[in-house]
Amino acid sequence: MRRLLSIIVSLVTAISFAQQPVELPLWPDGAPNSSGLTGEEQETRPHFVTNVTHPTLTVYHPEKPNGMAIIMCPGGGYRGLGMDGEGYDMAPWFCGQGITYMVLKYRMPNGH
């Protein structure tokens, strides 16, 4: 009985983690060729990010993967990154199709 309970807890934990997005730093030890930006990221309006100093890749794994994947690079008129409408909001649709979906939060040149 104890072993069965342990297996059930492990499966439930694995399933719950499989549906959570995973945020991976692109350069854990710091980005090469720094853009010169310092300070914290700024969210100037909901999910519109500027001053990206720590780029990341957020991965959404579908429940039933079909072997395909897409990397979304949100735009924002060269002022920042629209992380919702051009990024995170589309994850449920792609994952529903079995496609692994990734959102890239990338650096931009100084002042952007």
Give short role names for the model-derived ranges.
Residues 83-103:
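Short amphipathic alpha-helix adjacent to the substrate-entry channel of hydrolases
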Residues 76, 105-109:
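Short beta-to-alpha linker loops that shape the active-site pocket of alpha/beta-hydrolase fold enzymes
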Residues 2-10:
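Sec-dependent signal peptide recognition
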Residues 13-15:
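N-terminal signal peptide c-region/cleavage motif recognized by signal peptidases
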Residues 67-76:
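Short beta-strand element of the alpha/beta-hydrolase
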Residues 19-68:
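N-terminal cap/lid segment of alpha/beta-hydrolase-fold proteins
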